[in-house]
């Protein structure tokens, strides 16, 4: 039953993205991660736009297809200018779109990633789902920029995502410099290493992705450990 509801949510997100295809935005967050790693379920879809004019166009489409504008929850990941839209799929089940306007600002650290920076570090890629066979070609944030954003944010889900996609990083020196420009790199990498070194972390990965081979786990972990000593 739960899996059916999650599939329903994913199908709705893909339908929504197809409706928004002519809009000017970049996919970030969990759905962006799905372009670089084994797909996982994501509660909502996060997109970045440059200005209020684009927001008006996107909002018009979302309202037309059944979404309602909602007040962002207090525990929302983001801070600053962003709008949330939700569509009920069931009496207790909804899908949501978070639209970040002008920048992506992390609530905990107040680190800012300008929308222009996000667009400059994005490209057209294939978006894959976890439960549906459909694929979409969308503008998605590049892996190095996504890693920088998630390593600055450093929530539990961010660290898990970093672990899964870090072996595919393209320019580690650049990633480090982007983190350093917004936060204490030592603080962020220490937090990540502490988390991925715990037994609970591997168990948590298995809960999301199923069986995780020990050799692959160690390879991924070592990639991050070596990043800690890299010189930018």
Regions found by a protein language model. Give the residues of each.
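Compositionally biased terminal segments of proteins
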Residues: 1-232
């Amino acid at each position: 039953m739960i899996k059916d509801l999650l599939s329903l949510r994913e199908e709705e997100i893909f339908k929504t993205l197809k409706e928004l295809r002519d809009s000017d935005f970049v996919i970030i967050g969990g759905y962006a991660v799905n372009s670089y790693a084994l797909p996982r379920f994501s509660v909502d879809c996060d997109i970045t736009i440059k200005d209020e004019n684009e927001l008006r166009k996107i909002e018009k489409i979302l309202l037309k297809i059944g979404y309602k504008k909602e007040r962002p929850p207090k525990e929302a990941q983001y801070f600053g200018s962003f709008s949330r839209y939700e569509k009920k799929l069931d009496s207790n089940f909804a899908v949501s779109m978070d639209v970040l306007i002008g920048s992506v600002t992390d609530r905990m650290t107040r680190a800012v990633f300008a929308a222009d920076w996000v667009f400059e570090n994005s490209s057209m890629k294939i978006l894959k789902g976890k439960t549906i066979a459909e694929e979409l070609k969308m503008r998605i944030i590049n892996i190095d920029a996504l890693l920088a954003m998630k390593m600055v944010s450093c929530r539990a889900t961010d660290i898990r995502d970093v672990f899964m996609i870090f072996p595919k990083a393209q320019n580690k020196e650049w990633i480090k410099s982007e983190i350093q420009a917004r936060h204490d790199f030592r603080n962020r990498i220490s937090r990540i290493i502490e988390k991925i070194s715990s037994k609970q972390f591997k168990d948590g990965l298995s809960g999301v992705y199923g069986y995780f081979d020990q050799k692959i786990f160690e390879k991924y972990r070592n990639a991050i450990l070596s990043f800690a000593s890299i010189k930018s």
